[in-house]
């Protein structure tokens, strides 16, 4: 059986964030669109349609671009935890998300936030949001609970 590997592209956002795009053929999945403009620029430059949005947690630097993206791609589903108002599909530990011939396992990884999610694509690529930072662990806040970690 032929396995097609998607292209994964980081898009810098703000001063220290990344928005992730997973693309295959003429479609893309966007993870944590904190800003819409760089995502729209990339999609238009590459002739892509936005098929899905996956959100790791409810902080604005990961969600602020959702509304504008939905204006351009109105039928695009948004996957995330129940505390994300824009989520059209609530995902929990053990769920999976299907897209084209790919599957992402959903992990509940509380710590940075109580309802944080990570997505493991095809058992190979882990999208952690703020559970992990580049060259280090993610940040927790004073109101974080030890049982989250």
Give the ranges of each region predicted by the language model.
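Short, hydrophobic/aromatic-rich segments at coil-to-beta transitions
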Residues: 5-10, 103-105
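Active-site-proximal loop/helix segment associated with metal-binding centers of metalloenzymes
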Residues: 15-17, 25, 135-136
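Core dinuclear metal-dependent hydrolase active-site scaffold
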Residues: 20-23, 96-122, 126-127
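Metallo-beta-lactamase
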Residues: 1-3, 23, 27-33, 46, 113-149, ...
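Short Pro/Gly-enriched beta-strand edge/turn motifs at strand-loop
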Residues: 1-6, 78
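Active-site HxH/HxHxD metal-binding segment of metal-dependent hydrolases
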Residues: 14-15, 28, 33-107
């Amino acid at each position: 059986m032929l396995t097609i590997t998607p292209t994964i592209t980081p898009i810098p956002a703000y001063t220290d964030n990344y928005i992730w795009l997973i693309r295959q053929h003429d479609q893309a999945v966007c993870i944590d669109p904190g800003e819409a403009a760089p995502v729209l620029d990339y999609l238009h430059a590459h002739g892509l349609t936005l098929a899905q949005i996956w959100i790791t947690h409810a902080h604005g630097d990961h969600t602020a671009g959702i509304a504008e993206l939905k204006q351009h791609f109105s039928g695009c589903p948004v996957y995330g935890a129940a505390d994300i108002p824009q989520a059209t599909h609530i995902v929990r530990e053990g769920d999976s998300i299907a897209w084209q011939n790919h599957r992402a396992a959903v992990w509940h990884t509380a710590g940075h936030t109580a309802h944080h999610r990570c997505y493991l694509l095809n058992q190979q690529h882990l999208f952690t949001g703020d559970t992990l930072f580049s060259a280090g662990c993610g940040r927790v806040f004073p109101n974080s609970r030890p049982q989250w970690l």
